[in-house]
Amino acid sequence: MELVVQSRETDKKSVIKKIRQQGGIPAVLYSGGKSLANIVVDARVFSKFLSTLESGALASTVFTLSYEGREIKALVKDIQYHVTTYDVIHLDFEELVDGRDVRLNVPIRCINTVDCVGVKLGGSLRQVIRCIRVVCKPKDIVPFLELDVQSLGLSQTLKLSDICIPEGIRPVTSLKEVAVTVARR
């Protein structure tokens, strides 16, 4: 996803309030854990993009930020919402630097749910864990990890270790945890 961002000067409440009134989202771009720049993202463009995303996919979406004539690859590290309107009011981006490890949550997508043996026998498929914490290089980031549930029967479970994790991605979460189960109704 490509976003054009503008620089902003200050962190004063009055300035940030004015940015939001003009249709912007105040944001901070971090690099190596340190603040690199205060920026503004167009609220309409970002909200439209959010509405097209699958649940949980924002954490592993790589953004290309056009900032002061250069292209910066970044991940959303934190997002804050308004309490009542649920509008995005602040973003934190983390710059992706080639060769430097990045920690992120990657969503788990169950595939072949319609053909699941346990569901055909009247069971209910329950996804216990929806994402897995991993460490990888920016070039190895994947939008999601797939877990095939086709052969899962009634009262059976699949663990995180059953996910086919691509080379270059190291899970931080314990792989012994149950990811999906088929329960009797």
From Swiss-Prot:
GO cellular component terms attached to this protein's record: cytosolic large ribosomal subunit
Gene Ontology terms describing biological process: translation
UniProt GO molecular function: 5S rRNA binding; structural constituent of ribosome
Entry keyword set: Ribonucleoprotein, Ribosomal protein, RNA-binding, rRNA-binding
Record flagged with keyword Lipoprotein: no
Record-linked InterPro entries: Rbsml_bL25/Gln-tRNA_synth_N (IPR020056), Ribosomal_bL25/Gln-tRNA_synth (IPR011035), Ribosomal_bL25_b-dom (IPR020057), Ribosomal_bL25_C (IPR037121), Ribosomal_bL25_long (IPR001021), Ribosomal_L25_dom (IPR029751), Ribosomal_uL5_bac-type (IPR020930)
Keyword Glycoprotein attached: no
Pfam families: Ribosomal_L25p, Ribosomal_TL5_C
Subunit structure, interactors included: Part of the 50S ribosomal subunit; part of the 5S rRNA/L5/L18/L25 subcomplex. Contacts the 5S rRNA. Binds to the 5S rRNA independently of L5 and L18.
Cross-referenced NCBIfam families: bL25_bact_ctc, PRK05618.1-4
Family classification: Belongs to the bacterial ribosomal protein bL25 family. CTC subfamily.
Protein's job: This is one of the proteins that binds to the 5S RNA in the ribosome where it forms part of the central protuberance.
Protein name as annotated: Large ribosomal subunit protein bL25
Organism of provenance: Chlamydia trachomatis serovar L2 (strain ATCC VR-902B / DSM 19102 / 434/Bu)
